Amino acid sequence: MNNVKSGGRPVAIVAERYVVEKEIGRGSFAVVYKGHLADSSAGNVAIKAVSRSKLRNKKLLENLEIEIAILKKIKHPHIVGLLECERTGTDFYLMMEYCALGDLTFFIKKRRSLMDKHPLVRTLFEKYPPPSEHHNGLNRVLVVNYLQQLSSALKFLRSKNLVHRDIKPQNLLLSTPLVDYNDPAEFHARGFVGIYNLPILKIADFGFARFLPNTSLAETLCGSPLYMAPEILNYQKYNAKADLWSVGTVLYEMCCGKPPFKASNHLELFQKIKKANDVIQFPKHAALESAMVDLICGLLTFEPAKRMGFTEFFSNGLVNEDLSPYEVESEPDLETKSKNVAESNMFISEYLPTAERNKRASPIRLGDSCTLRGPCESPQGADPYPQDNTQSDQHEHLHADYSFQVEMGQDGQQADGEEKRKLYNNQEERSNEERQFGQVSNGRNQEDQLLLHQGRGQIPCEQNRQALQSHSHVAAKQIPDKDSKSSVSCQKHAASAPTKNDHRTTRLKEKTKCSYSDLLLEKEYVVVEKKSVEVNALADEFAQAGSGAPAIRLPDQHHNDASQALQMARHSSTSVSAANTAKQTLLRRNSRTLSSSGASTSRRPSLVDRRLSITSLGATNALSKALGMASLRLFGNSHQQSSNGSSTFKQNPNVTSLLSPQTFQDMTENAVLSADHQWDNSRQADVLHDDSIMKALENLTAKVYAIYSFAEVKFSQIIPLPPSSTQDPYTHKRMSNGSCAIDDEEDDIEHSPGAETYRKNSSGANANTGNYNFSLDTIHEMNLNDLPPNDLYILCTEAIVLYMKSLSLLAYAMHLTSKWWHESADKICPLKLNLLVQWIRERFNECLEKAEFLRMKTQSIQLHNGNQLSASTMVSEPVFVEKLIYDRALDISKTAAKMEMQGEYLEGCEVAYSTSLWMLEALLDDVSDEDNYNDDNLGHTGVLDKSDKEVIKRYIDSIANRLKALRRKLSR
């Protein structure tokens, strides 16, 4: 892309012939601009710019390459065409057909506003008025017209053995009619179907498409949940019929103005679809003909085998209905307005009033520099920080990247503080960099798309970027306090002066919450959430299955607020530290029960909550004490224990003691010391037997525990726990450099810049109750004082790759468990296996959250301390997780050897040797391609060659021999 000057201002030129104009659409990985040919302002195009920096793993890059390859091969009048593609060192540019009327959602959800402002849309809906003012459904003529155009494109795709996998209104674009033709004959001669003077539907966004013959099955989770076939939602293999389900949902929405099924999460959506039992409910105001109802019901059939097939669909009466009678009468007004729209060179959203365009959520995440720097000027009068004035009864067309606030419309009433805190915390939890490419629609206006997506937003021009950066720190940190104060203020007002509007406000809040859930689900992509949901769903199934004994009861989902955990800590009658008490409470609550019951579940606790769960090893016997002491001395972390070396937990009557941290601790200790080292991936075919699956899980659990513990050390250095108020004979101070502090009894932390911050923040702690006043803001400030930005950035990077390695092993463990479970005839599992599965679920969710939190922290460091980060840090050698684990394993084994030679802490030496062995063996595990991760320099896998593995095997043999000799010594 080149920058030249035209008329005194810079102009961006792509492929030496396309001029870049305003931004008209935005997604997670791409920005769409309006453009035109350099030698003619009449040749409009849509320029899709994809930054290579956003495609941070192989899957995302593959999706883009697939989209380019498919669009190059297919040419159809009802599919958005690819005109040209250019690759540069930093970006991909796709020059595509320009669709000035946006996408189908504009006609459905913005119809009323557009009728007032858009001349072509007003004329169109005057001729084909909506069937009812009570819903947003379209006139039957428009519905059938677009149904036929959609079916024409699908028929072409099937002839090429292609399945789109993401058909939804946002990917159905509308182009201006009567632009380069004048009559029906010419219209149909060009291959178009339908009515010649209506906007023309075109399928867009092939980021998820793939070649899939009729006889083939796929199992990749793709698409948008509200329009996703149930077999995909349930992680079953699927075929091209999945597209027909999506067609059914689009057809239903065109008729009724809303999707057929709504839910707050994917599993609940699946349960609702299944519970409907193929009985589709239609709004009472939507008077549909029987043929339309039959077609929708045939497409929305739960079982793919019973669902209408392509042959039946393509031969349906509505799909083949003769629409020529609607073309008999000439419509000069439509033709004139179409040409005026084309000549005006305005995108559909530019016709909306500023207030309507700004009726969107306010961004609170900060973006990086714009992908494309050109003449992208903010529209005159547009607010660069649009506040959310969204009416709660209207489902706005938003990209649900969890980066917006919900406020209460024109009444000025804000959503309650708790709900807004959940929205804010959700930003910390979502993993956008794992989202698949393709969530871009041309049908979004420029102001709407000033949303700054979580951690990776893009701003269309340099001046906006600088302005937002100047407000970044304040915006990010003021939101929680602002929410709390607003909530308190509203509550006081309600208590002192109740009004007759209270009930209406309550209903408005409830509707806003529903709309929020709808928005999240409507646009959410779940390719990378597949494993997360699978892990939790399988663990739920195990927890409910039992094993002759009572089933493991799941955590109470109605009380997962961190404040309750702290309250419990404050009023505990036992002399247990606040951290231990909070750990017991949160551990019971943090199992994300995305249950198959269909009930809406609460959010995962935020990192502010979950930070409390990183506490001591609750030792109750000599072996546990040795493990706790050894981990403190060998790993050098700051975990605390109670004064007598044991922990007392206040048991929640709603949860059995089987889910207590002590049970998990004893189980993992046993796995580290006694799991079968002989099991490896080559024996995965044996997992159909109960004893084999147990050996496999114990083996993987031990490896995960060793690497996870190392990751926890890194995490505790980034966000340290407040010091325990109870003196512990095994307490060992953390070294700021992360080294093992075994031979060095003096600690530099007491004299570090962060030490005073520790003392200030722990001064309010009560020695008996463990009452800590510890906020996220304080932690952030303490961290920046404790470690320089360079060290903190490297530390975060190392912790991320360790958590990711743990995640890959945990996912593999659940894959083996799922295989055993679904091929088991009796569906009865041993209690120990059940506990292992619950532990794996706990660690998976925790590692996922912390890895995402750390990723955002690295971005925050770059944003706030970019000029302080040395160039060597930003361009240094990538962090290899294999080298981290290898070096740590050797350090642990060498330190244990010194202790053994001195005759000290022999039980701890046994744990150390075992831990070192598991870490080295984990390096030899083969990870499938889809589990590899490569996020810039965040974790490079698959780097060990044959000679490296031979070296590791020699160390494994050597350490194993020392461990055998030590155990013989201990048995005497």
UniProtKB/Swiss-Prot annotation:
Keywords: ATP-binding, Autophagy, Cytoplasm, Kinase, Membrane, Nucleotide-binding, Protein transport, Serine/threonine-protein kinase, Transferase, Transport. Pfam families: ATG1-like_MIT1, ATG1-like_MIT2, Pkinase. It catalyses: L-seryl-[protein] + ATP = O-phospho-L-seryl-[protein] + ADP + H(+); L-threonyl-[protein] + ATP = O-phospho-L-threonyl-[protein] + ADP + H(+). It is a peripheral membrane protein. Its EC number is 2.7.11.1. GO terms for biological process: autophagosome assembly; cellular response to nitrogen starvation; cellular response to potassium ion starvation; cytoplasm to vacuole targeting by the Cvt pathway; mitophagy; piecemeal microautophagy of the nucleus; protein localization to phagophore assembly site; regulation of autophagy. Residues 359-394, 424-444, 467-506, 562-605, 743-764 are annotated as: Disordered. Residues 424-436, 750-759 have a biased composition (Basic and acidic residues). One of its GO terms (cellular component) is phagophore assembly site. Residues 562-584 have a biased composition (Polar residues). It is found in: Cytoplasm; Preautophagosomal structure membrane. Residues 18-319 form the Protein kinase domain. Coiled coil: none annotated. InterPro entries: Atg1-like, ATG1-like_MIT2, Atg1-like_tMIT, Kinase-like_dom_sf, Prot_kinase_dom, Protein_kinase_ATP_BS, Ser/Thr_kinase_AS. The keyword Iron does not apply. Residues 585-605 have a biased composition (Low complexity). The active site is at 166 (proton acceptor). ATP binds at residues 24-32, 48. One of its GO terms (molecular function) is protein serine/threonine kinase activity. It is an enzyme of class 2 (transferase). Homodimer. Forms a ternary complex with ATG13 and ATG17. Serine/threonine protein kinase involved in the cytoplasm to vacuole transport (Cvt) and found to be essential in autophagy, where it is required for the formation of autophagosomes. Involved in the clearance of protein aggregates which cannot be efficiently cleared by the proteasome. Required for selective autophagic degradation of the nucleus (nucleophagy) as well as for mitophagy which contributes to regulate mitochondrial quantity and quality by eliminating the mitochondria to a basal level to fulfill cellular energy requirements and preventing excess ROS production. Belongs to the protein kinase superfamily. Ser/Thr protein kinase family. APG1/unc-51/ULK1 subfamily. This is Serine/threonine-protein kinase ATG1. It comes from Eremothecium gossypii (strain ATCC 10895 / CBS 109.51 / FGSC 9923 / NRRL Y-1056) (Yeast). The gene is ATG1.
